[in-house]
Amino acid sequence: MFYFHCPPQLEGTAPFGNHSTGDFDDGFLRRKQRRNRTTFTLQQLEALEAVFAQTHYPDVFTREELAMKINLTEARVQVWFQNRRAKWRKTERGASDQEPGAKEPMAEVTPPPVRNINSPPPGDQTRSKKEALEAQQSLGRTVGPTGPFFPSCLPGTLLNTATYAQALSHVASLKGGPLCSCCVPDPMGLSFLPTYGCQSNRTASVAALRMKAREHSEAVLQSANLLPSTSSSPGPASKQAPPEGSQDKTSPTKEQSEGEKSV
């Protein structure tokens, strides 16, 4: 018969080395130790919020008194206040970030005006307008007061002083009498007028200008005794026609005036 001999087991040896089971359990619990989440009741939250409304940093005596009142530990109360302050700071930061953010979309909706490259800058436009206004004022001061039939804003094509002066001298030579001073134009005062009309009188119609010219012609002919005084429209002040016997007296006056002009 065969007998199997089994060696005796080693006594006093641990299966995992020399570490005991108690030491292993204590180390495992230390590594895995976690704080439990505290669930606050409605009464506890109301008491905590009331103290937080008074002060965000309660001292240790206030925390201990509050902990005894709501049946919590002082450590739990301190952690709650830390979390509550962090939440309050986050809320304040979010509110401050939303205020400038509300104005940014308005800036995006209204883009800045686009200026044409060929157009002059705003400063040059203002300067040019000011210069044009000063030139117009200086022109009005240079021209001075004008007669009723010599408006300074007539175009150059309608206001030809040389032609008008020749027509008046021709009428005077036909009749042999001098014209009144109001009908004699001043070529020197109107010769420098521009060939364009004023900005304010561009709406004047050609018919109105023709009517004024016709009235003026009638007034001139009336002063020269070529037409009877039956004009319906009022004309410039003119002298009465001298009698037939006084024509001989007026001719020396004309000869004297022509002699003075020739000198």
From Swiss-Prot:
<feature type="region of interest" description="Disordered">
    <location>
        <begin position="88"/>
        <end position="146"/>
    </location>
</feature>
<protein>
    <recommendedName>
        <fullName>Dorsal root ganglia homeobox protein</fullName>
    </recommendedName>
</protein>
<dbReference type="GO" id="GO:0021559">
    <property type="term" value="P:trigeminal nerve development"/>
</dbReference>
<dbReference type="InterPro" id="IPR009057">
    <property type="entry name" value="Homeodomain-like_sf"/>
</dbReference>
<dbReference type="GO" id="GO:0000981">
    <property type="term" value="F:DNA-binding transcription factor activity, RNA polymerase II-specific"/>
</dbReference>
<dbReference type="GO" id="GO:0001764">
    <property type="term" value="P:neuron migration"/>
</dbReference>
<feature type="short sequence motif" description="OAR">
    <location>
        <begin position="204"/>
        <end position="217"/>
    </location>
</feature>
<comment type="subunit">
    <text>Interacts with RGMB.</text>
</comment>
<feature type="compositionally biased region" description="Pro residues">
    <location>
        <begin position="110"/>
        <end position="123"/>
    </location>
</feature>
<comment type="similarity">
    <text>Belongs to the paired homeobox family.</text>
</comment>
<dbReference type="GO" id="GO:0003677">
    <property type="term" value="F:DNA binding"/>
</dbReference>
<dbReference type="InterPro" id="IPR001356">
    <property type="entry name" value="HD"/>
</dbReference>
<dbReference type="GO" id="GO:1990837">
    <property type="term" value="F:sequence-specific double-stranded DNA binding"/>
</dbReference>
<dbReference type="GO" id="GO:0007411">
    <property type="term" value="P:axon guidance"/>
</dbReference>
<dbReference type="GO" id="GO:0007399">
    <property type="term" value="P:nervous system development"/>
</dbReference>
<feature type="compositionally biased region" description="Polar residues">
    <location>
        <begin position="220"/>
        <end position="235"/>
    </location>
</feature>
<keyword id="KW-0217">Developmental protein</keyword>
<dbReference type="GO" id="GO:0021516">
    <property type="term" value="P:dorsal spinal cord development"/>
</dbReference>
<dbReference type="GO" id="GO:0005634">
    <property type="term" value="C:nucleus"/>
</dbReference>
<feature type="compositionally biased region" description="Basic and acidic residues">
    <location>
        <begin position="251"/>
        <end position="263"/>
    </location>
</feature>
<feature type="compositionally biased region" description="Basic and acidic residues">
    <location>
        <begin position="89"/>
        <end position="106"/>
    </location>
</feature>
<dbReference type="GO" id="GO:0009593">
    <property type="term" value="P:detection of chemical stimulus"/>
</dbReference>
<dbReference type="GO" id="GO:0030182">
    <property type="term" value="P:neuron differentiation"/>
</dbReference>
<keyword id="KW-0371">Homeobox</keyword>
<dbReference type="GO" id="GO:0016048">
    <property type="term" value="P:detection of temperature stimulus"/>
</dbReference>
<dbReference type="GO" id="GO:0003700">
    <property type="term" value="F:DNA-binding transcription factor activity"/>
</dbReference>
<keyword id="KW-0539">Nucleus</keyword>
<dbReference type="InterPro" id="IPR017970">
    <property type="entry name" value="Homeobox_CS"/>
</dbReference>
<dbReference type="Pfam" id="PF03826">
    <property type="entry name" value="OAR"/>
</dbReference>
<keyword id="KW-0805">Transcription regulation</keyword>
<dbReference type="GO" id="GO:0007409">
    <property type="term" value="P:axonogenesis"/>
</dbReference>
<dbReference type="GO" id="GO:0050954">
    <property type="term" value="P:sensory perception of mechanical stimulus"/>
</dbReference>
<feature type="region of interest" description="Disordered">
    <location>
        <begin position="220"/>
        <end position="263"/>
    </location>
</feature>
<dbReference type="Pfam" id="PF00046">
    <property type="entry name" value="Homeodomain"/>
</dbReference>
<feature type="DNA-binding region" description="Homeobox">
    <location>
        <begin position="33"/>
        <end position="92"/>
    </location>
</feature>
<dbReference type="InterPro" id="IPR003654">
    <property type="entry name" value="OAR_dom"/>
</dbReference>
<keyword id="KW-0804">Transcription</keyword>
<dbReference type="InterPro" id="IPR050649">
    <property type="entry name" value="Paired_Homeobox_TFs"/>
</dbReference>
<comment type="function">
    <text>Transcription factor required for the formation of correct projections from nociceptive sensory neurons to the dorsal horn of the spinal cord and normal perception of pain.</text>
</comment>
<keyword id="KW-0238">DNA-binding</keyword>
